[in-house]
């Protein structure tokens, strides 16, 4: 039985999809200093707080974060990616496990940040609300002489992030599937089933995650998108038309955005191709019209992780809702919390 969702996608299936020109502009990210008008009243982010599922809980086994590791990049010669590996306490090398990859890994694993994905996985795995899974926190590529991204500087101006994440080709998908995944398969017992592979991100990391699944649906089937930059940074606003013009792909998508995300005036006069909220809604309508397994939540949040972090546990539950389950009444293992695997000498 499917989980209760935030909104019923079928309600918007008949909605019209505004048509936009199909020639993307190879532009760069807007200036982080740019400001836009906000509605009167409290800060739009003021109501969003992390809940207990995003915080360490007494008695819940904590996974281990290993790394950092360095991945030399072939798709973008001269660059390298730093990544960390989350290994849950319940990981058993004898049992194939699920996989979740987070772009802008430094932000998703930040213990004082707005996302704290490792806590979410600890809590939900323990309560059997998502499968046991390996988590990967991967940063955008950079040259060795460039600084590592940090929670306060995600690297738009100092790394390869803008190009890797916002481009609509398959080069970043190659980084993940052809360069990173073979290393993970060697080290961990990760399922080869694409239904057991998820990928997510925030802002440009969200469109990057969508592009990986779009280009490689036989490798990734679940996409978590927070304030996705489906705008004209490097042509991302064309995705709704691409979705409608293509055969439906076997991917599941959760879109999260806010009414006070960047609203099209970062570069001056209003430009609908640079309206984050509009473009997320357009993508939702296209995915719904084509029959995708898609869910969404629209808040009043600004661009950032406040709202996405607050509902990340629910996004993860929905994306991973259909894992195997035992209904045997005497299965006391299934009826109990997932316990850590005893490590063998």
Features from the language model and the residues they span:
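Non-catalytic cap/lid and distal C-terminal segments of serine-dependent acyl enzymes
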Residues: 22-345
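Bacterial N-terminal signal peptides that target proteins for export
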Residues: 1-10
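Cleavable N-terminal signal peptides
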Residues: 8-9, 19, 54
């Amino acid at each position: 039985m499917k989980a209760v969702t935030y909104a019923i996608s079928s309600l918007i299936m008949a909605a019209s999809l505004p048509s936009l020109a199909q020639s993307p502009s190879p532009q760069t990210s807007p200036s982080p200093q740019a400001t836009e008008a906000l509605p009167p009243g409290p800060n739009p982010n003021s109501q969003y707080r992390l809940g207990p599922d995003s915080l360490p809980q007494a008695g819940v086994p904590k996974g281990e974060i290993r790394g950092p590791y360095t991945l030399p990049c072939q798709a973008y010669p001269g660059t390298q990616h730093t990544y960390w590996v989350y290994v849950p306490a319940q990981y058993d090398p004898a049992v194939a496990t699920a996989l979740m990859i987070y772009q802008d890994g430094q932000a998703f694993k930040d213990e004082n940040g707005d996302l704290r994905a490792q806590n979410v996985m600890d809590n939900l795995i323990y309560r059997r609300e998502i499968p046991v899974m390996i988590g990967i926190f991967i940063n955008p590529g950079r040259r060795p002489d460039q600084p590592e991204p940090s929670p306060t500087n995600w690297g738009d101006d100092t790394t390869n992030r803008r190009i890797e994440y916002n481009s609509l080709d398959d080069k970043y998908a190659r980084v993940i599937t052809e360069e990173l995944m073979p290393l993970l398969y060697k080290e961990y017992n990760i399922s080869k089933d694409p239904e057991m592979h998820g990928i997510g991100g925030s802002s440009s990391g969200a469109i990057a995650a969508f592009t990986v699944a779009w280009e490689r649906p036989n490798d990734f089937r679940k996409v978590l998108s927070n304030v996705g930059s489906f705008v004209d940074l490097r042509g991302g606003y064309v995705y709704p038309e691409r979705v409608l013009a293509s055969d439906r792909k076997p991917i599941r998508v959760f879109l999260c955005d806010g009414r006070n995300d960047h609203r099209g005036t970062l570069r001056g006069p209003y430009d609908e191709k640079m309206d984050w909220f509009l473009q997320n809604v357009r993508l939702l309508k296209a995915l719904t019209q084509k029959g995708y397994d898609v869910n969404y939540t629209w808040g009043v949040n600004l661009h950032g992780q406040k709202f996405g972090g607050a509902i990340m546990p629910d996004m993860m539950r929905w994306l991973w809702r259909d894992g195997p389950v035992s209904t045997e009444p005497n299965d006391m293992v299934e009826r109990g919390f997932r316990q850590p695997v005893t490590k063998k000498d």
